[in-house]
Amino acid sequence: MTARGLALGLLLLLLCPAQVFSQSCVWYGECGIAYGDKRYNCEYSGPPKPLPKDGYDLVQELCPGFFFGNVSLCCDVRQLQTLKDNLQLPLQFLSRCPSCFYNLLNLFCELTCSPRQSQFLNVTATEDYVDPVTNQTKTNVKELQYYVGQSFANAMYNACRDVEAPSSNDKALGLLCGKDADACNATNWIEYMFNKDNGQAPFTITPVFSDFPVHGMEPMNNATKGCDESVDEVTAPCSCQDCSIVCGPKPQPPPPPAPWTILGLDAMYVIMWITYMAFLLVFFGAFFAVWCYRKRYFVSEYTPIDSNIAFSVNASDKGEASCCDPVSAAFEGCLRRLFTRWGSFCVRNPGCVIFFSLVFITACSSGLVFVRVTTNPVDLWSAPSSQARLEKEYFDQHFGPFFRTEQLIIRAPLTDKHIYQPYPSGADVPFGPPLDIQILHQVLDLQIAIENITASYDNETVTLQDICLAPLSPYNTNCTILSVLNYFQNSHSVLDHKKGDDFFVYADYHTHFLYCVRAPASLNDTSLLHDPCLGTFGGPVFPWLVLGGYDDQNYNNATALVITFPVNNYYNDTEKLQRAQAWEKEFINFVKNYKNPNLTISFTAERSIEDELNRESDSDVFTVVISYAIMFLYISLALGHMKSCRRLLVDSKVSLGIAGILIVLSSVACSLGVFSYIGLPLTLIVIEVIPFLVLAVGVDNIFILVQAYQRDERLQGETLDQQLGRVLGEVAPSMFLSSFSETVAFFLGALSVMPAVHTFSLFAGLAVFIDFLLQITCFVSLLGLDIKRQEKNRLDIFCCVRGAEDGTSVQASESCLFRFFKNSYSPLLLKDWMRPIVIAIFVGVLSFSIAVLNKVDIGLDQSLSMPDDSYMVDYFKSISQYLHAGPPVYFVLEEGHDYTSSKGQNMVCGGMGCNNDSLVQQIFNAAQLDNYTRIGFAPSSWIDDYFDWVKPQSSCCRVDNITDQFCNASVVDPACVRCRPLTPEGKQRPQGGDFMRFLPMFLSDNPNPKCGKGGHAAYSSAVNILLGHGTRVGATYFMTYHTVLQTSADFIDALKKARLIASNVTETMGINGSAYRVFPYSVFYVFYEQYLTIIDDTIFNLGVSLGAIFLVTMVLLGCELWSAVIMCATIAMVLVNMFGVMWLWGISLNAVSLVNLVMSCGISVEFCSHITRAFTVSMKGSRVERAEEALAHMGSSVFSGITLTKFGGIVVLAFAKSQIFQIFYFRMYLAMVLLGATHGLIFLPVLLSYIGPSVNKAKSCATEERYKGTERERLLNF
């Protein structure tokens, strides 16, 4: 039974109809010319024919699956050669992923040569053709249907969709699909490759996609390879960069730090609010406890000043002196005697002192003939030894300076958007206003006019052609112009090119534009126009660089055109640089004067910022002059003390005020001159800030000295020189304390590496010290002469004229301001009920300032550095509003890496076989997280493109077999042979000598339709070839772009993240500790590096300044530790409150504001040191009395000297045209004066009345002995 069933089954199988796939062709050989050098294939319906042996190499190279048996195929050798030629472009871009290219070869090999063509190819249109050689009539295949399995098409697309094109920072399919890579899919890619309009296919092939038989046709559905699979035993899978499957999960950025909150509120606010409430509770609790205690045992601690008592020592002061008291008293006495003798000498010998002062001033100021003013922004903002500056120098030396940029951003405000209707069908496409054909023609006219601008330098004519960046020079000398009009080769005729008839426009500039923004490197668009997209300079014009204001990637919605003219920059070649600057000057003048009502233009040139900074300085000179004039006028009038109208011209001190001002200015000139001698250049900050600072210090000292004399009464038998010497002995220690502490603080501030702070600190420290020296020498002598003039009743200024005799002598007198401070202000401020209110208010303000301390913005808005009326302000606004690409960034691998070994190559490259943590791969990974890393695109990789270029399957790398010279792919010469053999070894990457042999050829090869991988345009400057002891690769770079950067925070974060990436690359390459490393470079890094450490720099500079002030104060007060602590604490409060004002007033932290903070530290010394010292040396009985005396005597001089002087000058700065003056000078100067005045004249006296140091016992005893028996009133008691 079993045997019978088996036999029956065999019989049924034999009888069952079977489908037999016979081998049959649809074509064989090539026939007539389709167009250009493209030919039709000849129709042929017979069996496949044996391939001639001279075609064996080709079929092994292209279609090794057919190389078996007698190699019978449906193609001849000529067809195979055509197939190879047509595959050159895909080969260059897709062969970096072997499985992708394997599937593509499968598609074309089956189409061209398969012995079973008739199963999946259907000829749909033919025409007769007469062979001109044999006169035989043949048939051209004009149209064809190709039945392709849908699963095969999808698998091929999936294997290729991630493949990168390193030279264009884009996906390879974006260049091969006729669409943007994101819009490409399996079907439209294959349709595009088979469309004759793509410039490569000789005739139309219509693909039909199906996984099932259709109309008796069996779709070609060969096995495919995934991109994570190897195509053979020796070839690796595709790299992570070209195959996302290999990469594993996409890296995720770390989550942003959660805001620090308490109960949902900002933690700093909550903490400071609780702290302040706790302080108030403790403080007022203690206050009321003490108040109740005092009510029980005492009447009040407060007693008014009795100016008839030289000192007042209560019982508690009769105790023993501490160990430091004698030292302090001795030091105080030494300083008093020294300055007393010196003052007497200066008054007795005015001619000698003034003469030598003038000699000193002349000698120092003469250095100004060597003055150099730094206006280069790089020198202003970046220290020569900073990391960014050193990296810039390295980049400039090895690759040349980053090109100079001339850029226009153009809008069409009067033009509406329009709708384009594609032919024959398709959704309507909106086009933005600047993409109107008439606007484009006008913009092209403007662009051509700019190209024709000429400038004159050294009696020579300079044109754009002389200075522009021409990457293919000398083969192609066209300038690089990044403009949408370069899609039309900067030609009016190409822009007007259209195809159509009387009824329809089939293709015009809209069609070409939509194609070029998807494939900017294309040499032939797929429309009927067949115009190239490649720029005339030989490179692609990426749409995100030339269009602005669009949404997502809808470039057709652009609302702005961006035109960029890169100009060569020069390293240490001043003449060439000045030629470029001369042309830029004419460019700026041209665009400024260009008139076109249809266009609104924002523009910049490389020199624009420097030019506008210089113009800003010139434009604000008038404002600054008025500011100083007001201060000078006030000083001159306020120094005098008029007692009657008759003596107005006698008692005025205009001449003395002018002399004091000239001394201040002379000290500034001396400082500038001394440092000019040693070659230290000036900066704009020094010129603008130091006169203000020195005037503050100098005027304060002048008022203290003059008013101390005015309140003093000459003792019986005392001469003028003795009186002035005694007055100087009383006030000069205070002047010395403030000036010397500021000098030391500023000089220590010069330890900062920030150029602005470093330079300012040096100049300021020396200027303040010289000012003090001139004041205790020259000014004392001048004061003595002025007093003699006054005593002789001679008029001020007109000293030869005598005034009317009134019988009165020059007597001690008190000004109205002094009387106000003495009789009204001081008693009111120091009343028992007022002092706690003052403390509570000031601590409250301090608490608020601490709460917002971490909220002050960091950076400097570029537009703020420009005048209000500058064209650059509009340009900066346009950048943030319209631009879609950030600055280019170069990841530089320093000289020292071995590129010739497989290990060294794998550490760098991003293609097949490269490490998953290679340099290129890590930058590629960073671009996937662009919102976090601020890296916008995959990097262009010269080494990956070189490996694709040198492959033996490619027609790119060929040499003359006789001369061994390089043959470009466009050269047709039988002597040109492939560089490397088509063997398994030849298909591997070149190593050792081969690597270096062919690399120079790659770097000199220009791209062309047969080889788009030539590296001349893209990489000629990216690779240093070192000659000498064997040719080797030196420093190289890998370029990409940052994302759009708009704010200072964006720029700072971009720099920080780029350095983090480079550091990680250096570490994973294992070259930490080597002589070379990877670092990022972009043109803006030198300007924003300071902000990476600005907080640390601020803490360091202000901390050093406070430390210096503390030490100097403690020493000069005779080891009065507690006085120094109180004074420095008050100055620290001023600084913290400055940050509060900065937050409230929108002032960011940067080098300019840091200089002002350092200066505010110095000015605060002026407000605080005199009060503190007056309190310390006062002999009154209680702290309240001593605080009142100090405030009465010194407060009025400080208020009239520094506060009123500066306030008048500052108000004028509010009217400056410069935004930087308005924000960083007017606002900060006003804040530092108001905060300094309120803390020095309100808070500090109150604080001293609570916790000030006790009376120096040794000094008290000495004072009592010194004035025992005298009846003279002492208004100032030191």
UniProtKB/Swiss-Prot annotation:
It comes from Homo sapiens. Its main location: membrane. The gene is NPC1. N-glycosylated. Changing H510P: In NPC1; late infantile form. Changing P691S: Abolishes cholesterol transport. No effect on subcellular location. Changing Q92A: Decreased affinity for NPC2 and decreased cholesterol transfer from NPC2 to NPC1. Changing Y1088C: In NPC1; juvenile form. The keyword Transport applies. The keyword Transport applies. It is found in: Late endosome membrane; Lysosome membrane. Changing R518Q: In NPC1; late infantile form; Common in Japanese. This is NPC intracellular cholesterol transporter 1. Gene3D superfamilies: Multidrug efflux transporter AcrB transmembrane domain. It catalyses: cholesterol(in) = cholesterol(out). Changing C177G: In NPC1; late infantile form. Belongs to the patched family. It is linked to Niemann-Pick disease C1: A lysosomal storage disorder that affects the viscera and the central nervous system. It is due to defective intracellular processing and transport of low-density lipoprotein derived cholesterol. It causes accumulation of cholesterol in lysosomes, with delayed induction of cholesterol homeostatic reactions. Niemann-Pick disease type C1 has a highly variable clinical phenotype. Clinical features include variable hepatosplenomegaly and severe progressive neurological dysfunction such as ataxia, dystonia and dementia.
